């Protein structure tokens, strides 16, 4: 019985420690290393069978704040994001444009911009978020269709 308890405790502790390795950012931070953040996101995505969304923008960007609020406050969107995606904020600002990191992806025309990656970090899609806008917010149906199109297949 003690061996079973010890095994379960170690298994739980290992899962807890691994889960602590990836912590989503709440803000765009010019001091963060996007390569390190992506590496942690890939590890987490592989263990949870999720895709990754690189959310490129900055604290200066009003639409970046609008999309954050929309994703957080729209129940159906938040549910899809929580179940199928790992979000990584990539800063683009005058303090740090992360040009070297972003040079490995297609050119961006505006912010915020999403890159959808599979759990191994392979680019699946480049999304101009302007296509998801509606008036001064985002279109729930378009956003849900986008998330459903690029979510991973669960095995």
What do the PLM-derived regions correspond to, one by one?
Residues 18-32:
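N-proximal helix/coil linker or "cap" segments that precede and/or mark the start of modular domains
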Residues 109-154:
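Non-catalytic, surface beta->alpha helical segment in thiol-disulfide oxidoreductase systems
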Residues 32-34, 74-97:
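Thiol-based oxidoreductase modules, predominantly thioredoxin-like and allied folds used
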Residues 103-109:
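Electron-transfer interface patches adjacent to heme c in soluble/periplasmic c-type cytochromes
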Residues 56-72:
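Conserved redox-active cysteine motifs that mediate thiol-disulfide chemistry
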Residues 1-22:
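Bacterial Sec-dependent N-terminal signal peptides
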Residues 32-52:
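A short beta-strand-turn-helix
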Residues 48-52, 83-88, 110-112, 119:
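Loop/turn elements at helix/coil->beta-strand transitions in domains of secreted/extracellular proteins
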């Amino acid at each position: 019985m003690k061996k079973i308890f010890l095994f379960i405790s170690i298994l739980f502790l290992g899962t807890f420690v691994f889960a602590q390795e990836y912590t989503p950012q709440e803000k765009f931070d010019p001091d963060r290393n996007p390569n390190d953040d992506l590496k942690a996101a890939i590890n987490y995505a592989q263990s949870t069978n999720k895709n990754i969304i690189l959310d490129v923008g900055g604290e200066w960007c009003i639409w970046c704040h609008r999309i954050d609020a929309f994703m957080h406050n729209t129940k159906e969107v938040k549910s899809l994001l929580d179940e199928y995606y790992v979000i990584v904020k990539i800063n683009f600002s005058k303090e740090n444009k992360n040009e070297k990191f972003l040079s490995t992806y297609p050119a961006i025309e505006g912010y915020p911009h999403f890159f959808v990656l599979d759990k191994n970090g392979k680019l699946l899609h480049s999304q101009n978020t302007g296509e998801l806008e509606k008036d001064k917010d985002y279109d729930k149906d378009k956003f849900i269709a986008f998330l459903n199109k690029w979510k991973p297949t669960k095995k």
